[in-house]
């Protein structure tokens, strides 16, 4: 810390005044400052390294390449006079635990300890406890099919002006609680995106919500999910006609997933046949015309698939 910063970081106790010479934990600006420092330190290594505060993930295609990448990173850290604790390092692994996920071999899944914490979570008795539970499971919502539908009884229990009042734990709440636990215990797996292959967005909307799956197909034609999305329609959107609701699902998907889709062709699969003509003919519907214009920067093709062939997306929309 600079001399000026040391004065502001100091604190007084019964035993005297303590002034840190280096940045301690607990300062409001510490995460930003350290993140900026690590980003500058590892500049030029973005192709094989991702820093997050004091965690550095290094990924390589082979062991020889990994050794070279390690050498580059360790030299940069050494030149900056930073220290690494060996017991907290994990080198040359096929899979690693990173930010609550087990990552490696092109797939990711939730960390077992995090799942166990949710499984051991007692039935909530207050709105505060429900929010804590939803916060825990919400981090893994992209692993769970029809997540919005499953947690609906829990989110409905949060209604009311009093944010801390006791709740009535209904059988529907218990069922949602048990279902979420069961879904996570199954150890869901998501695949890493392969940018050499086209992305596929599968969209299906019901009367009350929309469900989305981002996936890719391998050489055998098997679908591999990358993530799941779903949301309810707000009050105004509930009044939309069927075609508008289906198109709204596409708009929602592309807004959420544009960083996967920018600059490359992709397919949109829907069970609503009229949307196949979205690019060329939307009639006189002003809302569909605006959405069609909003989609023009993207290179997409809409393909009709019967609802029976995309059941997992159909389930996501039943919220």
What are the roles of these predicted feature ranges?
Residues 1-265, 274-281, 285-291, 296-302, ...:
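Retroelement reverse transcriptase polymerase core
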Residues 267-269:
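C-terminal accessory regions
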Residues 311-315, 319:
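Short, Lys/Arg-enriched alpha-helical microdomains
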């Amino acid at each position: 810390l600079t001399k000026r910063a040391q004065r502001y970081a100091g604190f007084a106790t019964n035993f005297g005044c303590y002034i840190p010479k280096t940045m301690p934990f607990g300062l409001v600006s510490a995460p930003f400052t350290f993140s900026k420092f690590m980003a500058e330190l590892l500049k030029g290594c973005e192709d094989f390294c991702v820093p997050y505060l004091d965690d550095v993930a290094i990924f390589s295609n082979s062991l020889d390449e990994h050794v070279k990448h390690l050498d580059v990173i360790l030299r940069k850290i050494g030149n900056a006079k930073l220290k690494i604790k060996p017991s907290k390092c994990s080198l040359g692994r096929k899979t690693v635990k990173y930010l609550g996920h087990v990552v490696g071999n092109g797939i990711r899944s939730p960390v077992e300890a995090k799942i166990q914490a949710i499984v051991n979570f007692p039935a909530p008795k207050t709105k505060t406890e429900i929010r804590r539970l939803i916060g825990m499971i919400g981090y893994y919502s992209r692993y769970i099919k029809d997540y919005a539908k499953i947690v609906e009884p829990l989110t409905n229990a949060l209604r009311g002006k009093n944010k801390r009042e006791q709740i009535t734990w209904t059988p529907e709440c218990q069922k949602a609680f048990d279902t979420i636990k069961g879904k996570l215990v199954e150890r869901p797996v998501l695949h890493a995106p392969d940018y050499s292959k086209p992305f596929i967005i599968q969209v299906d909307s019901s009367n009350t919500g929309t469900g989305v799956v981002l996936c890719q197909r391998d050489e055998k034609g098997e679908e591999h999910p990358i993530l799941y999305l779903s949301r309810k329609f707000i009050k105004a959107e509930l009044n939309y006609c069927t075609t508008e609701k289906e198109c709204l699902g596409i708009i929602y998907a592309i807004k959420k997933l544009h960083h996967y889709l920018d600059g490359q062709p992709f397919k949109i699969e829907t069970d609503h046949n009229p949307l196949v003509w979205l690019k060329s003919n939307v009639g006189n519907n002003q809302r569909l015309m605006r959405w069609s214009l909003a989609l023009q920067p993207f290179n997409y093709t809409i393909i009709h698939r019967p609802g029976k062939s995309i059941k997992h997306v159909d389930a996501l929309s039943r919220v």
